[in-house]
Each structure stands twice: as C-alpha cells, then as structure tokens.
Amino acid sequence: MFRAETFEADATGHLPDQKVLAAKITEMGKSLEALRVAPITDPYNGPAILSGRAAAGFFHEVLGHRLEGQRQRGDDEGQTFTKLLGKQILPSFMSVSDDPTLKKFDGTWLSGHYYYDDEGQQARRVDLIKNGVLDTFLMSRLPIAGFAHSNGHGRAEVGHMPTGRQGNLIVTSSKTV
C-alpha cells in the first residue's frame, strides 16, 4: 500500500508549516490503516465520478498525453487523435486548454508554469478542445502534418530533444453537478 501527499510552491516559504505537515502525516496513517482492514472488492467496470487529484491525473494521462504533437507522428505513438481534428471528441459542454503561463489556480501553485519553453518560444495558452471539438495539438518546433509551428509547448527531459508537452492542462465544463 502506498500513500503520498505532495505540495507545490514556487519557493520554500510558500510550503506548508510543520503543523500542516504533521496533520497530513496523521491523516495518511489513518487512511493506510483503513485500507489495510478494508474488504477486497471485485473489479468494477462502469461509470465513475472523479474529483480533485484523481480527475487531474485521469485527464493528464488519458487525454493530455494523446494531445501532444509528437504522439501524432508515428504509428508507434498510437495516433489516437490524428484523424479526429475538427471532430467532436468530448461532450459539447467540455473544453480543454493548456496554459503554462498560470502560476496559481484557486490558491494552488502549479508545477507546469514556465515563461519560455525549452526551445526559447514564449509560453502561451493553447485551446486544444473547444466545446468538445478537437482544435489543435501541443506543439514544439518539430512539425507534424498540418502544424508547421510551435505553440510554446516544446519541453525536454535532460538528454532528450524537446517535444510538445503539457504545462497546466485545464478542463472546463459549462455543466456541473
């Protein structure tokens, strides 16, 4: 079993104090104990409601990576959305953008913030899906068919070439529950 808590800040002075950290440790301990004694359930396949970090992780992994430009390039990348440009891929009440210019959102520091990408291009908001319709991809300077220019999302891991990557993926909905 594993439990972790992460804190995002632009400087150490913005991290939680010892009292908050101690409370989180106690909370994680209680959560682990509850998991340890919880009954094992059968796998579930059906609708789910996600919130908070679970929703963020889901959209980052399942949708965000598929919208990175290099994922449209080769067969080995899946090309999930390559032929769906201009088509409905989400409900019309949902839109998705990526905005590395945001430092904070609702009081939370965002780790995807940057001023310039790893190719020297100025960071900027990109509206990827508008009202459910796929509009564009996250691009570096390495072109793909139909996209000759960077949109400020060229990011690289140490020792690797920059590719179109997520900064701060923002999912919005005009319908809420």
Predicted regions and their residues:
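Generic signal for short, ordered secondary-structure residues
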Residues: 7, 75, 79, 105-111
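Dual-mode signal for accessory low-complexity, basic/Gly-rich regions
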Residues: 84-177
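Short N-terminal helix-initiation segments at or just after the protein's N-terminus
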Residues: 58-76, 156-162, 170-171
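Amphipathic alpha-helical
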Residues: 68-93
